[in-house]
Amino acid sequence: LTGFAALTWAHPPTPPAWKLAILAGEYGHFLALLSGLLVSLVLAQGGALGWNRFAVLVLLGVAAGLLLWPAVQAWRISRGLPDRLRAVWGVGAVPSRAALSLGRLFLPRLTRRLPVETREVLRVDGAGGLPLDFYRAVDGPRGGAPCVVMIHGGGWDGGDRTQLADANHRLAARGYAVAAISYRLAPQHRWPAAAEDVVAGIAYLRSHAAELGIDPERFILFGRSAGGQLATAVGYRPGQPFIRGVVAYYAPHDLHFAWRNTPEGGILDFFKLMRQYLGGAPEEASRAYDEASAYHAVTPQTPPTLLVHGGKDSLVWFRQSERLAARLAEHGVPHAYLALPWAVHAFDFNPDGPGGQLADFALETFLTAVTSGRREPASR
């Protein structure tokens, strides 16, 4: 138990350890209760404590502390998070609820399951269609609901539109239409195929806005990991005033930087992923690396952006989001960067965990802010 708890403190060195680290960091508070129960059982035995029992108590105490540490860090961040977000997005955008709820940690919310409509978006190359799952907004406004375009992760060579679908249901229940799109995958399809499919998905949604009940002038691109790279790469292109904002969780935004700073033999073979996605190393496919790196596309007209990243992410270095946040600040682009020191890649697998709650609070604030009012057309 203590070894498992240590994953809340250390960077996970292997894929299995990474998956266990998600459980330790975002569900560990449940196991901390188990540690407390075991301590009670040891003490209830009575008699002399002895070195063996003392060692067991120490280990259980350490385990409980480590397992509670993410929740403690989240609580500390939650105390200042509303004010941080108000400073960027305004008073009216921040929810009145607490950024972190103890009740939600131990009694997760039930997700209201909504109908899902699957549609087909024709590929740019005319060689078939790609499925799109659409979640209609609950009680959407008469003029059409804002639409969140959900772009899945998976290292550009895997994943699909059904990833973490509970988030789509929750957003739709809050009054946002959600479109979980598909895109062609590497290595069969290299850049810019995936980006073209994102653009095609948005075009489809805009052309069918009336029947879908969405506002064609209020889109938000939301991607996790590889999907976050696509969200910023596509969302930061000029001439798209209908893109009100971009959300990226634990994503790489500068693939030149990723190539230079990826260790050999890491938890993820990022060199292989980039080669098959972009067509080679940077010296072989420099244009693709440039086009796919939103970091180099930032201007004062870049859409408002929300970035979320875990400090213990062993798959995508948190410096990717940190650097993009600094770049956005240099150009005066409204943005927020939520850093979660304990969190690993895909921490939001548990939307009611310490990281999931803080990210959800920041997301709700962001969506309220960027879908209100009117964004002026970009002129870059």
Q: Can you describe what each PLM-predicted range is?
A:
Residues 159-168, 174, 179-218, 237, ...:
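Catalytic nucleophile-loop/oxyanion-hole region of alpha/beta-hydrolase
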Residues 143-154:
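Short beta-strand element of the alpha/beta-hydrolase
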Residues 1-4, 11-15, 25, 32-35, ...:
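C-terminal catalytic histidine-bearing segment of alpha/beta-hydrolase fold enzymes
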Residues 255, 312-316:
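Acidic catalytic loop of the alpha/beta-hydrolase fold
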Residues 88, 92-103, 232-287:
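Hydrolase active-site cap/lid region
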Residues 301, 307-309, 313:
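Short beta-strand/loop motif that positions the catalytic acidic residue
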Residues 42, 200-263:
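Primarily recognizes the serine-hydrolase "nucleophile elbow" in alpha/beta-hydrolase
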Residues 4, 9-40, 92-143:
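N-terminal cap/lid segment of alpha/beta-hydrolase-fold proteins
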